[in-house]
C-alpha cells in the first residue's frame, strides 16, 4: 500500500475520532436470558457499535452505547446512541458463566441488532426483541473474556 493511501486512512480515522462530523444514531435491544430454562439474573450485557470497517481495532475501536445486568427474571433492556459518519452496526454482548464449571473468565457471545432497528437521533424509536436466549448452549463465534 502506498504511503499516501496509508496517510489517507490515518487522516480519515483521526478526523472521525474528533467527533465533530457524523450524526447521532440510536438503537435499543431487549430480551430474556436463561440458563437451562431458569432466569439468568445478574448477567452482564453491553450494547456496542461496530467500528471494524477496516478490520478489528484498526483506526477506531467499537463504541459502548449502553451496559447493564439482567434482572431477577433474566430480563434486560438497553438503549443507547453514538455518533458515526456512516450507519451504525449495533450488537449485544453477553458475558456469562452458565454451564461453565470452574473454568476461569466468562463465556462471551454477540447478537447483532438488525439495521432496521436503528435510527437517527439520540433515542431509539423501536426496540429489537431478541426473545429468550438460552445460555447453556455454545454460540457461533463464542469466546472467553477475563476483562469485561
UniProtKB/Swiss-Prot annotation:
Keyword Cytoplasm belongs to the record: no
UniProt GO cellular component terms: cell surface; extracellular region
UniProt keywords, alphabetically: Glycoprotein, Secreted, Signal
Signal peptide: 1-17
Domain of life assignment: Eukaryota
Keyword Cell membrane annotated: no
Pfam families, per the entry: TTR-52 (PF01060)
Residues bearing glycans: 77
Entry-linked InterPro entries: Transthyretin-like, Transthyretin-like_sf
Localization of this protein: Secreted
Entry-linked PANTHER family: TRANSTHYRETIN-LIKE FAMILY PROTEIN-RELATED, TRANSTHYRETIN-LIKE PROTEIN 2
Protein name (record): Transthyretin-like protein 2
Protein's organism: Caenorhabditis elegans
Lineage: Eukaryota, Metazoa, Ecdysozoa, Nematoda, Chromadorea
Amino acid at each position: 500500500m502506498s504511503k499516501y493511501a496509508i496517510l489517507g486512512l490515518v487522516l480519515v480515522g483521526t478526523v472521525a475520532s474528533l467527533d465533530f462530523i457524523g450524526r447521532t444514531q440510536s438503537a435499543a435491544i431487549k430480551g430474556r436470558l436463561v440458563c437451562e430454562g431458569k432466569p439468568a439474573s445478574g448477567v452482564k450485557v453491553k450494547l456496542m457499535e461496530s467500528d471494524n470497517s477496516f478490520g478489528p481495532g484498526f483506526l477506531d475501536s467499537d463504541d459502548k452505547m449502553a451496559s447493564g445486568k439482567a434482572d431477577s427474571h433474566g430480563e434486560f433492556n438497553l438503549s443507547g446512541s453514538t455518533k458515526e459518519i456512516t450507519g451504525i452496526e449495533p450488537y449485544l454482548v453477553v458475558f456469562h458463566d452458565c454451564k461453565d464449571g470452574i473454568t476461569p473468565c466468562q463465556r462471551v457471545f454477540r447478537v447483532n441488532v438488525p439495521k432496521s432497528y436503528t435510527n437517527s437521533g439520540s433515542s431509539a424509536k423501536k426496540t429489537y426483541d431478541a426473545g429468550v436466549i438460552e445460555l447453556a448452549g455454545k454460540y457461533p463465534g463464542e469466546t472467553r473474556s477475563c476483562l469485561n
